[in-house]
Amino acid sequence: MLCRAACSTGRRLGPVAGAAGSRHKHSLPDLPYDYGALEPHINAQIMQLHHSKHHAAYVNNLNATEEKYHEALAKGDVTTQVALQPALKFNGGGHINHTIFWTNLSPKGGGEPKGELLEAIKRDFGSFEKFKEKLTAVSVGVQGSGWGWLGFNKEQGRLQIAACSNQDPLQGTTGLIPLLGIDVWEHAYYLQYKNVRPDYLKAIWNVINWENVTERYTACKK
């Protein structure tokens, strides 16, 4: 379900969806834990601002942009439709990425995955530690704002690591199905870790929800 949900969310964000009839309105998802639940690794102030301000802004701007798009679509205004594409990508990607991100985290997270996901990580990266090192390095190395991702290549049946700039969604950008995302925008860590992104990356491994990542992996293999 998680894989299908991610894919269907991406389709709903497409400009043609809902052109006829009532238009789907996106909403801010509730967190599955309290704002302070991830402390001391990610503090409550960051979580509150990140969720209730930043993610909410992506949702609101996405709805507003889609409204303008559908008005332009109804008028046959192709120029406006094209002009709105960057805003659809940015705000739609922000909504997709953060919706995955919140479920990728848990106050009971950390440690290592189990079962077939762990075996796949060992197969594709050599060991769990090598995987952590690579995803950490890719995430730390993002220039400016963006995301580090563990994704599933459906065609090859293998796990891959990738980085996306700004709010570019992983699947729409690379074709990889998102399993685990690490937000490296400064708003995700600056209030606690200042400009030391590597310290934030070191801390976030303590709250990774491997059960959620495993569910996504299992669903996407079907």
Curated annotation (Swiss-Prot):
Listed cofactors: Mn(2+)
Cofactor annotation comment: Binds 1 Mn(2+) ion per subunit.
One GO BP annotation of this record: glutathione metabolic process
Keyword Metal-binding: yes
Induction: Expression is regulated by KRIT1.
Annotated S-S bridges: none
GO molecular function: DNA binding; enzyme binding; identical protein binding; manganese ion binding; oxidoreductase activity; oxygen binding; superoxide dismutase activity
Main location, first listed in the record: mitochondrion
Key word RNA-binding present: no
Subcellular localization(s) per the UniProt record: Mitochondrion matrix
Described function: Destroys superoxide anion radicals which are normally produced within the cells and which are toxic to biological systems.
Name of the protein in its database record: Superoxide dismutase [Mn], mitochondrial
